[in-house]
């Protein structure tokens, strides 16, 4: 049997719409992500477990893990009889790369089980394709960091899909999921078809400056440049209490904050553990809307998807 864990990820990071993403892991050592197991069987079966299993489609063929198995078999040109188990620990429509977790864990598990017939680049391409079935367009800003770990910049040139950007060890990512769902497709539909020239210029300046600050090891400058003129001005209206929360965490001492992925999760970046804890406490009391919500203090997950057993 092969068991694979795929971590949560925070896409866009305010400054890099559709081209930046970071894999994250709680500092307390708990797992924030999905687990997929693959075992030999006479015919294909899929079993769903975990805290959010009841949110998955009831029809097996609509389950993204089934679609991963089907696409993997197509790639190899043969049917592979296996028993798959999805441990769905990530809330759907959370802005934490929930579908990417399932896609990455399923495809890595299948590849490991079959003796690694596909290389990382081919696997990542298929991951983006399957993620696109859910979000409505192929993009890699969740699957790439989830699979490869760390902070990833999407390249998509010369056969390179993404490359790692150096992060900062002192950065702590406070992630607050309020317990409501926002579909990626809905969050994309709310965006304008065209942008003003000055917004495009600002976006390019922020992103280029952020990447430069990461490579030149200027954490304060990097955090200052984490600004979103592309998505947040439009998506904020989908998130109750978001604007107030951003103001509050800034007053507490967060270096930057924004929407994780397409929301509703809010991320706040801190460089001191006590600040991160105070931010987490405030968000836990004021941003969460029901019992399904949670707050985690995280750091970059540099390992990405990994075999557990």
From Swiss-Prot:
Top-level taxon: Bacteria
GO molecular function annotation: ATP binding; homoserine kinase activity
Compartment(s): Cytoplasm
Alphabetically ordered keywords of this record: Amino-acid biosynthesis, ATP-binding, Cytoplasm, Kinase, Nucleotide-binding, Threonine biosynthesis, Transferase
InterPro entries, alphabetized: GHMP_kinase_C_dom, GHMP_kinase_C_sf, GHMP_kinase_N_dom, GHMP_knse_ATP-bd_CS, Homoserine_kinase, Ribosomal_Su5_D2-typ_SF, Ribsml_uS5_D2-typ_fold_subgr
Reactions that this protein is recorded to catalyse: L-homoserine + ATP = O-phospho-L-homoserine + ADP + H(+)
EC numbers on record: 2.7.1.39
Keyword Amino-acid biosynthesis: yes
PROSITE patterns associated with the record: GHMP_KINASES_ATP
GO cellular component: cytoplasm
Entry binding sites for ATP: 91-101
Top enzyme category: transferase
Pfam family, one: GHMP_kinases_N
Main localization of the protein described in the UniProt heading: cytoplasm
Metabolic or biological pathway: Amino-acid biosynthesis; L-threonine biosynthesis; L-threonine from L-aspartate: step 4/5
Gene3D superfamilies, sorted: 3.30.230.10, GHMP kinase, C-terminal domain
Cross-referenced PANTHER family: HOMOSERINE KINASE, HOMOSERINE/4-DIPHOSPHOCYTIDYL-2-C-METHYL-D-ERYTHRITOL KINASE
NCBIfam families named in the record: PRK01212.1-4, thrB
Family affiliation: Belongs to the GHMP kinase family. Homoserine kinase subfamily.
Function of the protein: Catalyzes the ATP-dependent phosphorylation of L-homoserine to L-homoserine phosphate.
Protein's UniProt name: Homoserine kinase
Species: Citrobacter koseri (strain ATCC BAA-895 / CDC 4225-83 / SGSC4696)
